[in-house]
Amino acid sequence: DGRASDFAWTNPPKVDDTSSYAKLKLHLAYILTIPGVPVIYYGDEIGMTGASDPDNRRMMRFDDDLNENEKQTFKDVSKIIHIRKNHPALRYGDFLTLKADKNIYAYVRSDMNERVLVVVNKNSNNQKVEFILPGIYKVNKAKDLISGGEFTIKDNKIVLDVDGTKYIILKLEK
């Protein structure tokens, strides 16, 4: 009689755990800052869910049809895309891994004009991390490209507190 399909159509898949939005943003920050061409499937920029085929994704929703988590996800992802667009090292630069363990992945993207340090924390707990940057960098401060905050680098060492399931994108400066 079609009732099951009517139910599915009027009750689209939803995000069960709101921590999924933070995980999605962490993933998108990663793919937008590593080498290669980032691919974002439509709706990922808002955390849109899907179900099994043929209900992979519904029609795209905009503005007033988004919940607060989706609006914030879109805002945060847009900011990362803007950072990628305005910092060529994130698109074309060399890649140097500084740390890779079960919780933290940190790397620097460098070109002839700038160096950008990216730190992703996949753990749900805050992590204090310390990095010794290559001496050739000759940098003494870092600017957070998300918040605008500044960090001091002394003797090529930078210490950061990274919130749980978060990322930091820093421009290294002289």
Residues of each region from the PLM?
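Active-site and adjacent substrate-binding regions of carbohydrate-active enzymes
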Residues: 1-174
